[in-house]
């Protein structure tokens, strides 16, 4: 089956209305994009979690609607414009989208990723690249974190170089469970992953089972407030600052804290947020991101 893609450039305040109208009139899918993407005028829109976006669409928004080959996009666009009280009907672009083996196409875009000296993240449709590699079998999909982002790589490299056998580990904001899983594969003891997203918890459990690793994954309210030898959190700077007291309390006396998801320019303010409990320094940076680490001293 072939498809038709219809692209309409609209004003920022019309993007949501156009999306709703096209979908109601039979579009198979509708998305809104920045019309200036990949140009000097590209407009960042969404910030970190905990910070409300200043606006909900780009100044020059592009509405992209997908139709089946039996649909008449011209009729649909005209009907949507009439429904919205817009006259004349705006210009739009049409292009044919040929049906493909979408699974094979998607798989071809993901190759094994080497992290550090021995760690490899390998999709299920690939073989392990080295016989003595520490292999994480992980497919892109249900939740976040396949090892491709610098912050994930930094945390995994830290674990490879610094984790001590038998240490207990808390992975806060576990996403796909990748850090908890690699910690267990590197010799960690009891390991717990926490995430506020039930889908992430589900994905982490699935990935741990697939990798033949024993680790616990749960929502925050389901986990006791125990302390750990190592706490790792790869989130973003604003949530990390808000959770400074809580995350620090999860680190036992003499234990270590590892944070990432922090830009180089944000490192000092994140370290300052944790200063009442433990000192944090930059362990390593990559592509503008940093990994912070520190040891909690003996508690009074």
UniProtKB/Swiss-Prot annotation:
Q: Which SUPFAM superfamilies match?
A: S-adenosyl-L-methionine-dependent methyltransferases (SSF53335)
Q: Name one GO biological process term.
A: methylation
User: Which keywords label this protein?
Assistant: Cytoplasm, Methyltransferase, S-adenosyl-L-methionine, Transferase
What transmembrane ranges does the database entry give? none
Q: Which reaction does it catalyse?
A: L-lysyl-[protein] + 3 S-adenosyl-L-methionine = N(6),N(6),N(6)-trimethyl-L-lysyl-[protein] + 3 S-adenosyl-L-homocysteine + 3 H(+)
GO molecular function annotation: protein-lysine N-methyltransferase activity
Q: Which Pfam families match?
A: PrmA
Task: Look up the EC number in the record and give it.
Answer: 2.1.1.-
Q: What is its main location?
A: cytoplasm
| InterPro entries given in the database record | Ribosomal_L11_MeTrfase_PrmA, Ribosomal_PrmA_MeTrfase, SAM-dependent_MTases_sf
Enumerate the subcellular locations listed in this protein's record, separating them with semicolons. Cytoplasm
The residues that the entry says bind S-adenosyl-L-methionine are 152, 173, 195, 234
> Can you supply one Gene Ontology CC term for this chain's record?
cytosol
What HAMAP family does its record include?
Methyltr_PrmA
Q: Which PANTHER family match?
A: ELECTRON TRANSFER FLAVOPROTEIN BETA SUBUNIT LYSINE METHYLTRANSFERASE
> Which family does the record assign?
Belongs to the methyltransferase superfamily. PrmA family.
What the protein does comes down to:
Methylates ribosomal protein L11.
Descriptive protein name = Ribosomal protein L11 methyltransferase
Question: What organism, scientifically named, is this protein from?
Answer: Cupriavidus necator (strain ATCC 17699 / DSM 428 / KCTC 22496 / NCIMB 10442 / H16 / Stanier 337)
